[in-house]
């Protein structure tokens, strides 16, 4: 995944798991549990990221927690972060931060589709699920 991301010519990318639904059903009895919005437009630009989901139509993929930014955009992100109130800095998730940055600066992040067997591990149960399905 990292090799594909590094070799991609795009500078400001948010890779996503296109096979998210299979893994979500393995992790949760209720697939809407812990699911977040991930919506992009026809130009493959992120429109919405993070936040509660009401239907699967709001999930075009799963944010993988991996990002690729140019040094110029990294500086912009850091400067934007410094403007947030201290209490918000301590609580904000990455998806909420990226959405807030996008909303307030009108910056567009591009998406990069990944078709790998990606497993998010937040809990011990997630670890057991990943271990069961990942090949050595």
What is the meaning of each model-derived region?
Residues 2-80, 84:
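Conserved core of the sugar-phosphate nucleotidyltransferase
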Residues 1-2, 95:
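Short, well-ordered alpha-helical microsegments
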